[in-house]
Design a protein with these regions (language model features):
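Short active-site neighborhood of thiol/selenol oxidoreductases, capturing the structured segment around
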Residues: 13-25
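Typically the conserved alpha-helix immediately C-terminal to a functionally engaged Cys/Sec
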Residues: 29-43
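Thioredoxin-like thiol-disulfide oxidoreductase module
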Residues: 42, 46-105
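N-terminal "domain-start" segment that seeds a small globular fold
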Residues: 1-11
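Conserved hydrophobic/aromatic "anchor" residues
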Residues: 9, 22-23, 79
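Receiver (REC) domain active-site loop signature in two-component systems and cognate sites
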Residues: 24-27, 82
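The canonical Cys-X-X-Cys-His
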Residues: 27-30, 76
Length: 105
């Protein structure tokens, strides 16, 4: 699974279906969800999946929240051709992620 940052965010989310997992290394639900996101990615080769570490870039948490409409973490957003089409807060299993994807397809 690849990482995404603001420098390449628009490019990587501009085509097709893309799931972005906003997380932090200190967030226990985020760490528990990592395996679920990996399982989802392995069973959905048509979806690009990226992780966005909210502490990794130069922006503050408040800037990340504002720019990407992140309400809390873990936070998952599905983009279709550059536009957000689904967003979910909290721990999600791979099955729940699949249901979210199925609802937008």
């Amino acid at each position: 699974m690849d990482y995404i940052a603001d420098g390449d965010f628009a490019k990587k989310t501009s085509q097709g279906i893309v799931l972005v997992d906003f997380y932090a290394t200190w967030c226990m639900p985020c760490l528990r969800m990592e395996k679920q996101v990996e399982e989802f990615a392995s069973s959905n080769s048509n979806v690009s999946v990226y992780k966005y570490d909210v502490d990794r870039g130069v922006q503050t948490w408040n800037e990340v929240k504002k720019k990407h409409n992140v309400r809390s973490i873990p936070f998952v957003v599905i983009y279709k051709d550059g536009e957000p089409v689904a967003a979910e807060v909290g721990y999600k299993s791979s099955e729940e992620l699949q249901k979210i994807l199925d609802n937008i397809s």
